[in-house]
Structures are given as structure tokens and as C-alpha cells.
Amino acid sequence: ERPLVLDADALNLAAEGLFDLRALAKSRPILSTPHAGEMSRLLGESKSNIIDDRLAALREAVRRFEHCFLLKGTPSLILNAGRGILVGSQGTSDLAVGGMGDSLTGVCGALLAQGLGVMEAGALSLYLTGRAANLAARGASLTPTDVIQWIPDVLVERGAGISELGLPFVSYDADAAR
């Protein structure tokens, strides 16, 4: 089966029990991309508990639903069963506006359609959208359109091509969060 990326209303419907997220994950690769509010509904925990220990929430979601999760926030975290945790290193708090999650999900879907694995698609999507936000340099007025318009520039950027982690899209030289 083809991979799925789930966000927003799909996650809310799963939280309401309208479909079995765990059973669906047995039939195909899934990447779920909740923010803290969506994760709180999925896990039946308060949003403050999710925010207080994002890593524990991420681990619990992966354990309970048996697929890859990208927990959006500062920093964004990605985890899949049996894999290490990936930490998003690009972007700023300016990405926390309406529509940015849709941009991230769209990039994830495009990368999944090209054959990337769910964890790799999530990590590369975080990098592409975060770096594009940094290049747009719009500050608090940043819009999803700004981010999408800068992705082609990110794709042609050239760096050293070396990563101590063996992942060419992970870097730790990001600007400090605002």
C-alpha cells in the first residue's frame, strides 16, 4: 500500500475513534504530524502534559499507534519504532502560524510520493520548510506562501555535504529560536 501522511482533521478523527489508527498503520507506512494540541487529543492527555514532556509523548504515540510521528514544535521531533530520534534544526517560532503545518504536510506527501521512507520524508520536510523560512527572513509576517516560494532555492543550495550523523539534511548550525 502507498504511504500516508496524516495531519489536522485526520488526527482529530482518529482521536474521536472514527477510524483505528493502529490498524491502519499495519496496512501501510504512515507519518502523523501533530502539534501539541492534536497529540493531546490522540493520547488523551492534557496539552500542558504534552508540552512539558514532548519526548515522552512522542514515544508513547509511537508505542501506542505503531507508526512514525513528527511532533511539531520547537524543536520538532521525529520518531519511529526501532529508530533513533531526529530533531529538526531549522526554522524559527515564526513557523507557528496557520497554514504552516499544511505546507509541511504537502512537502512530506511529495517526498513520500517520490519513494522516501516516512522518517526520512519527515526529516527532509522539516529541513526544507525550516530553511526556506530562514531564507525568506520575513520574521513575524512570514506566511506559508513565503516558505513554499523559497523551497526551490533550498533545493539548489550546496553545503559541505558531510554529516556526522550520516544524514545529509541534518545540521546543527541553525539560528537561535526567537
Residue ranges and their predicted role:
Residues E1-Q90, V156-R178:
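Glycine-rich phosphate/dinucleotide-binding loop and adjoining beta-alpha-beta core of small-molecule
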Residues D7, D102, A121:
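Hydrophobic, well-ordered secondary-structure elements that form the walls
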Residues D9-N12, G37, S93-L95, A140, ...:
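Flexible, active-site-adjacent loop/turn segments at secondary-structure boundaries
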Residues A15-G17, S46, G99, D146, ...:
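Solvent-exposed, flexible loop/coil residues
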Residues I30, S48-D52, L95-G98, R138, ...:
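A short glycine-/small-residue-rich loop at the edge of a beta-strand within enzyme catalytic domains
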Residues I51-R64, V87-L112, V118:
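Gly/Ser/Thr-rich active-site loops/lids in small-molecule metabolic enzymes
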Residues G99-G109, I148-E157, G166-A174:
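Short, surface-exposed, charge-dense and proline/glycine-enriched linear segments
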Residues G106-P152:
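Conserved post-catalytic alpha-helical subdomain immediately downstream of the catalytic base
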